[in-house]
């Protein structure tokens, strides 16, 4: 079942911000055009940055489009919101995208309710569509107990991967956002992590001393996905056996649908890789993005038989995509994965202890 629309604030600025955020969230959740959605996220930043006097002046003059970053669509949302109305764009987004993401079985719904957190998400520091604070607020609103921010590592330049210096700077941002969340009375625990590239030789694409300071590390292959199995298998085994690896991300790299087209799964000795995951207590990610559905069903069964832990993650690149966990929960329920073997059902304290146990 879908949740009822949230009550909108009555204060004009708070109402405008809530409406802009909800339009963005619902379109992100439905994986609509990112460029169009970014306009609403940018408008949030603009409206939030206005002084009280500036906000009052633009409200009275209806001069929202004079502001850089406010276009006709976002101006209409703000105008209707400050007038106390439900904006037309918001009503349409609720109608079109506010329903259930998928039809879930009772077992799937039960497992979704057991998920405490999410260990794979991205912000605008790399290739995400929103700043960390917006991601954290959305995760809190969805009832998550914790969220790990795991922006990309430097090798992945196309995704604006973080250099060592930028990763250190992000640590300060995480601390600031943690304080902001506390000041807002939110209970979400924010974890600082990384999605670190597995390089061709199986090493991890970041300084080991920095990786060791993080709460969690998702190791993923993003390059040379068509590498022969004889080369891909030792590459993945080296990453899994590295004590810094917590989660093996989207292990086949496949794409089954979506705007980026399709991509076949990488070839590797799955029995050997999953045996190593089980031995090293590295979780196999069950990536919830519908275009990935990674691992495939037959590999989930193989990892389950091998005794692996799992991590159901959204791989969200925008706040609304944090809701994609439902797809992962249903796949895990269909596969019969016991909840206790899914690390994202564990409390944050247990997750951090597990991720640090091999350091």
Show the residue positions of the predicted features.
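Ser/Thr-glycine-rich phosphate-binding loops at phosphate-binding pockets of nucleotides
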Residues: 119-124, 146-152
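Charged catalytic cores and adjacent phosphate/nucleic-acid-binding surfaces used
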Residues: 2-12, 76, 87-115, 132-137, ...
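Core AdoMet radical
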Residues: 148-149, 194-196
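Long, highly charged, low-complexity intrinsically disordered interaction regions
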Residues: 2-108
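Single, functionally critical "micro-switch" positions that shape active/binding sites
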Residues: 70, 119, 150, 249, ...
């Amino acid at each position: 079942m879908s949740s009822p629309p949230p009550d909108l604030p009555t204060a004009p600025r708070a109402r405008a911000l809530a409406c802009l955020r909800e339009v963005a969230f619902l379109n992100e959740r439905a994986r609509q055009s990112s460029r169009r959605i970014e306009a609403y996220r940018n408008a949030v930043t603009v409206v939030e940055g206005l002084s009280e006097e500036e906000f009052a002046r633009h409200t009275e003059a209806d001069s929202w489009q004079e502001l850089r970053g406010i276009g006709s669509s976002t101006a209409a949302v703000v105008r209707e919101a400050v007038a106390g109305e439900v904006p037309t764009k918001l009503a349409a987004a609720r109608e079109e995208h506010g329903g259930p993401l998928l039809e879930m079985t009772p077992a799937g719904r039960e497992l979704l309710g057991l998920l405490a957190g999410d260990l794979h998400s991205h912000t605008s520091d790399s290739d995400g569509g929103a700043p960390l604070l917006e991601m954290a607020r959305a995760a809190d609103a969805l009832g998550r107990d914790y969220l790990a921010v795991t922006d990309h590592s430097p090798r992945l330049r196309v995704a604006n991967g973080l250099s060592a210096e930028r990763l250190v700077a992000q640590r300060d941002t995480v601390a600031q956002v943690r304080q902001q969340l506390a000041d807002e009375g939110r209970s979400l625990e924010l974890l600082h992590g990384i999605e670190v590239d597995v390089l061709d030789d199986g090493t991890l694409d970041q300084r080991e001393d920095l990786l060791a300071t993080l709460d969690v590390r998702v190791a993923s292959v993003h390059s040379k996905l068509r590498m022969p199995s004889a080369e891909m298998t030792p590459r993945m085994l080296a990453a899994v056996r590295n004590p810094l690896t917590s989660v093996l991300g989207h292990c086949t790299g496949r794409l089954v649908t979506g705007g980026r087209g399709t991509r076949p799964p990488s070839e590797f000795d799955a029995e050997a890789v999953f045996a190593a995951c089980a031995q090293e207590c590295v979780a196999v990610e069950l990536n919830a993005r519908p275009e990935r559905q990674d691992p495939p069903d037959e590999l989930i069964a193989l990892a389950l038989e091998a005794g692996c832990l799992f991590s159901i993650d959204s791989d969200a690149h925008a706040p609304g995509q944090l809701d994609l966990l439902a797809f992962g929960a249903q796949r895990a329920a269909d596969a019969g994965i016991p909840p206790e073997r899914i690390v994202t059902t564990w409390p944050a304290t247990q997750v951090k202890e597990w991720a640090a146990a091999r350091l």
